[in-house]
């Protein structure tokens, strides 16, 4: 997916010859399509494809399904198994386009089972593969398409081979295997020799790959070649789609006039096709190109129109995105107060309809950067610039949840928490009401355009014409709006920061009460911005405050990568690198921590800060964990700070200690061997608890482990786990039998009775380049969402006995009545100070479990490599 521009993206739809309804006409019913009591199957197929040719409003059912269902019935009545399989495939494609993947899979599998010929079976397998691609199951998609390719090759069906290579390319593209995808598109192009439509689809796909890899000239050339072929076959939908992509390529080359020309031509086609969703997308793109070229007024006009259309169609996530883009332009114009109001309105949409993107038709998936979180980040930045710290803290809390939602993407959010929205101040509410009045005509135009042209009354046609001509005056109207006295008064009120303390005080008071119960805790929210670092501090007894640190995002990123390398190398002195980070993250708030008499830091790290444990920062004399207890949180609003743990803890301890498994994880081949120290770890833990169950290796499987986790207050998993940036299914916990549980799978866990989940051999930040830590955030979020109060995870896997030393001490502290946060801190301090009792206990544990020579254990575990990897997420009691 391209990072910048929204387009109808389904290449498969470009390939299939769909019969569009005549411009301006509504989709026919089965009766009107047939014109008689009986109807031939091909007519029903054509009518169904026409019905689904353009994206429908949200909640409008499954376009084309009634026609395909009628065709299925007719095929069965006439004993036509080929038509029956084709009808099932059409139904599967219709379900896929609206995101109903289980229903789509079921139809394609039924088609495969009854397919009477290699051609139809291959088509059915390709349909199945497309659903897997849409669902992110790339290996399954590739397997299905390769089976189809074998069938088409054996039958010497060149069109089937060309289609299949196109679908394979789309799967590889979804998996970001750019070179493999490009090769597949090129192969499809060769196979489609003499077929201009199929060649156009392949060339369009090649342009997408070039665009993703910033080969902009090559992208333009591919799109132009595709356009020639679309025009040769008269495919308006293909022309519209490729023009939209071509506009995106021109935009990235900063050739904004050419981009706007391409968008304008595509817009004209979308209007003749009554494709309102594409029309809204193109208006949005035009607004962005106008904005990038500094043409603020036409940019605002186009974005207002796009927002109105998205709202009318029910695509509320895209509506919110467009409102955010309007906020960007207002911010660039210096209208910060109005920009803040628009950002808050956008966030209100995002929070209200968090699942919207997942139910959009596949062709309408935006290829904009799907980073709704950037709106939260920009709003927090503006609020902090105006010292509106209470509001900024609330937005930062929402930011964490939006970031994890962006990462988890299509993980079911059936139990998503209600965190509220960005609270509007009275003046902002009034501003938005005035704004709504100003842009109301855009909404009216959107409503009228939803009426098919053949069904519009003369008065409606006249009203549309009047509204279109009035678009030229909208700029002046909005400028007049900005200058209105009542607007100026409201903006002045918003500039009075002395009033902001009255906002959202109930939530602040509740948060401060929680901090008081946590041993004088202080909540710290860092916010990484391009030109600086902001530290937001909430203490129990004073208003929130923020401190600005003059360090750029690039400088901080470099310092974090250096720190992570130092922490991972036990033979390197980590103190200089960790002191540099201390100077950025803690030194600016030292006085604030002292004034609050802080003993605990509740930490909500931002972006790559998630890869470096706060407790490992060094002040020149001590590690931070020696001074403060540190607890990480996903978001304050998701954390039950006061939940008291079970006074009679029970433990389920599982380990993978023997064997080796080779796994395909995304594009990586991973070989993972049993952890020789893991058996010692869990055996020692089981001996410490009266109510304990141990699962080793093959017994540590999915059917045995997951159902009984909620029967224990502590779940301890001593096995490989990798949390990596990318797709949620690429982050996983390895089970003892070689199976694995992904972050996606964890959404179904139930852990309501669990106080603590421990993963003692996690790895993050693999590959040496730090991402934004969304996978770490995602793990904490999923565990809390499943009901567990807290989790302990390692940021890197520690071998040679260090984990066992720390875990044994941690559980000893826990059994003595210490809270989870303090128990972990004291265990870490024991390793820092080289507590002899800890080392001797660790040696004895290995002596009891190893019948042969003892492993060569270190003489000291004082390096932060051994003790700082483990972070506590959530409740610390």
Write out the residue ranges for each language-model feature.
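Conserved alpha-helical positions within TPR/SEL1-like repeat arrays
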Residues: 45-57, 83-97, 120-134, 159-174, ...
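Eukaryotic all-alpha helical interaction scaffolds
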Residues: 68, 75, 95, 112-115, ...
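Amphipathic alpha-helical protein-protein interaction segments
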Residues: 337-622, 641-656, 660-661, 666, ...
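Catalytic-core domains of enzymes
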Residues: 504, 540-544, 606-714, 733-736, ...
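Catalytic cores of nucleophile-dependent amide-cleaving enzymes
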Residues: 637, 713-809
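An often Trp-containing, charged/polar helix-loop segment at the C-terminal end
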Residues: 803-877
């Amino acid at each position: 997916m391209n990072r910048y521009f929204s387009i109808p993206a389904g290449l498969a739809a470009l390939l299939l010859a769909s019969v569009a309804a005549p411009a301006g006409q509504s989709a026919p019913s089965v009766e009107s399509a047939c014109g008689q009591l009986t109807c031939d199957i091909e007519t029903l197929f054509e009518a169904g494809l026409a019905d689904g040719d353009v994206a429908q409003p949200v909640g409008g059912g499954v376009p084309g399904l009634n026609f395909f269902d009628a065709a299925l019935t007719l095929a069965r009545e006439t004993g036509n198994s080929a038509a029956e399989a084709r009808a099932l495939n059409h139904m599967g494609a219709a379900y896929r386009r609206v995101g109903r993947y289980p229903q789509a899979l079921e139809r394609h599998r039924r088609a495969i089972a009854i397919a009477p010929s290699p051609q139809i079976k291959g088509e059915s397998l390709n349909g199945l593969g497309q659903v897997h691609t849409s669902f992110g199951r790339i290996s399954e998609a590739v397997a299905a398409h390769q089976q189809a390719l074998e069938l088409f090759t054996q039958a010497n069906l060149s069109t089937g081979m060309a289609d299949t290579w196109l679908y394979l390319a789309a799967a590889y593209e979804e998996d970001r295997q750019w070179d493999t995808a490009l090769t597949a598109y090129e192969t499809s192009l060769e196979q489609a020799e003499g077929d201009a439509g199929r060649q156009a689809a392949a060339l369009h796909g090649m342009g997408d790959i070039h665009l993703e890899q910033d080969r902009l000239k090559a992208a333009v050339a591919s799109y132009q070649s595709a356009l020639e072929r679309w025009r040769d076959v008269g495919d308006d939908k293909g022309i519209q789609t490729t023009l939209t992509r071509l506009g995106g390529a021109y935009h990235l080359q900063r050739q904004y006039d050419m981009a706007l020309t391409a968008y304008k031509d595509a817009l004209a086609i979308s209007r003749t096709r009554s494709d309102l969703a594409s029309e809204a997308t193109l208006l949005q793109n035009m607004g962005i190109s106008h904005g990038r070229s500094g043409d603020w007024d036409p940019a605002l006009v186009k974005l207002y129109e796009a927002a109105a259309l998205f709202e009318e169609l029910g695509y509320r996530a895209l509506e919110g995105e467009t409102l955010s883009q309007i906020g960007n332009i207002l911010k660039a114009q210096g209208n910060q107060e109005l920009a803040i109001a628009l950002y808050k309105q956008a966030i209100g949409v995002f929070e209200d309809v968090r699942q919207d993107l997942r139910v959009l038709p596949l062709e309408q998936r935006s290829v904009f950067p799907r980073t709704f979180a950037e709106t939260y980040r920009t709003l927090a930045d503006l609020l902090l610039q105006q010292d509106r710290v209470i509001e900024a803290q609330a937005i930062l809390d929402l930011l964490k949840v939006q970031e994890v939602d962006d990462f988890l993407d299509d993980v079911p959010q059936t139990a998503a928490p209600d965190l509220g929205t960005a609270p509007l101040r009275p003046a902002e509410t009034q501003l938005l009401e005035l704004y709504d009045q100003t842009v109301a005509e855009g909404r009216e135009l959107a409503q009228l355009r939803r009426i098919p042209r053949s069904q519009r009354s003369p008065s409606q046609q006249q009203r549309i014409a009047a509204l279109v001509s009035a678009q030229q005056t909208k700029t002046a109207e909005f400028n007049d709006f900005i200058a209105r006295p009542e607007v100026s008064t409201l903006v002045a009120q918003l500039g009075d920061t002395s009033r902001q303390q009255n906002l959202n005080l109930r939530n602040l008071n509740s948060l401060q009460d929680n901090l008081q119960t946590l041993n004088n805790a202080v909540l710290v929210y860092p916010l990484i911005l391009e030109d600086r670092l902001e530290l937001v501090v909430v203490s129990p007894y004073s208003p929130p405050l923020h401190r600005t640190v003059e360090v750029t995002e690039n400088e901080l990123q470099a310092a974090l990568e250096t720190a992570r390398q130092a922490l991972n190398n036990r033979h390197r002195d980590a103190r200089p690198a960790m002191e540099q980070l201390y100077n950025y993250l803690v030194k600016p708030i030292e006085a604030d921590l002292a004034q609050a008499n802080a003993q605990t830091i509740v930490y909500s790290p931002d972006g790559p800060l998630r890869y470096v444990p706060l407790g490992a920062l060094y002040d020149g004399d001590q590690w931070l964990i020696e001074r403060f207890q540190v607890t990480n949180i996903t978001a304050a609003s998701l954390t039950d700070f006061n939940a008291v743990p079970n006074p009679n803890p029970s433990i389920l301890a599982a380990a993978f200690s023997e064997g080796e498994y080779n796994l395909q994880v995304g594009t990586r081949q991973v070989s993972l061997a049993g952890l020789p120290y893991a058996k010692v770890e869990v055996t020692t833990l089981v001996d410490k608890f009266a109510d304990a169950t141990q699962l080793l290796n093959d017994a540590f499987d999915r059917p045995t482990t997951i159902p009984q986790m909620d029967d224990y207050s502590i779940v301890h998993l001593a096995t490989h786990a990798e949390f990596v940036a990318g797709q949620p299914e690429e982050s996983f916990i390895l089970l003892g039998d070689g199976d694995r549980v992904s972050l996606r799978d964890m959404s179904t866990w139930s852990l309501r009775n669990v106080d603590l989940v421990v993963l003692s051999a996690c790895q993050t930040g693999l590959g040496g380049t730090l991402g934004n830590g969304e996978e770490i955030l995602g793990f904490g979020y999923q565990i809390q969402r499943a009901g567990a109060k807290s989790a302990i995870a390692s940021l890197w896997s520690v071998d040679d006995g260090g984990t066992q030393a720390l875990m044994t001490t941690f559980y000893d502290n826990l059994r003595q009545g210490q809270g989870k946060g303090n128990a972990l801190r004291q265990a870490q301090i024991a390793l820092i100070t080289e507590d002899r009792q800890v080392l001797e206990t660790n040696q004895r544990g290995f002596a009891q479990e190893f019948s042969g020579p003892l492993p060569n254990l270190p003489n000291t575990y004082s390096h932060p490599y051994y003790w700082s990897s483990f972070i506590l997420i959530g409740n610390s009691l």
